Amino acid sequence: MSKKSTSAALPSSFEEAMAELEQLVARMEAGELPLEASVAAYKRGSELVKYCAAQLEKVDNQVKVLEGDMLKPFNADRAIEADE
């Protein structure tokens, strides 16, 4: 027997997830949804936020690999001195 998923499928891209999340937030802020639908929207929004965070972390790790030894710790004091 297959397990039935109670949540919608994950989006195919970060941009798609963000667009859906923006729509959910707008509907919730506008007060268009009844209580049960608001809870479902909140749950879906939470899933989308987790998906987006995972995508951002994945891309961040890819950038770190690509930059390799070029990455250096940021020194705020030096940045301020350079601006002066």
UniProtKB/Swiss-Prot annotation:
Domain of life of the source: Bacteria
Nuclease as UniProt keyword: yes
One GO BP: DNA catabolic process
Keywords: Cytoplasm, Exonuclease, Hydrolase, Nuclease
Pfam families the record matches: Exonuc_VII_S (PF02609)
SUPFAM superfamilies: XseB-like (SSF116842)
Enzyme superclass (EC): hydrolase
tRNA-binding is among the record's keywords: no
Catalytic activity, EC: 3.1.11.6
One Gene Ontology molecular-function label: exodeoxyribonuclease VII activity
Reactions catalysed, as given in the entry: Exonucleolytic cleavage in either 5'- to 3'- or 3'- to 5'-direction to yield nucleoside 5'-phosphates
GO cellular component, one term: exodeoxyribonuclease VII complex
Purpose of the protein: Bidirectionally degrades single-stranded DNA into large acid-insoluble oligonucleotides, which are then degraded further into small acid-soluble oligonucleotides.
Protein family (similarity comment): Belongs to the XseB family.
Subunit structure of this chain's protein: Heterooligomer composed of large and small subunits.
Protein name: Exodeoxyribonuclease 7 small subunit
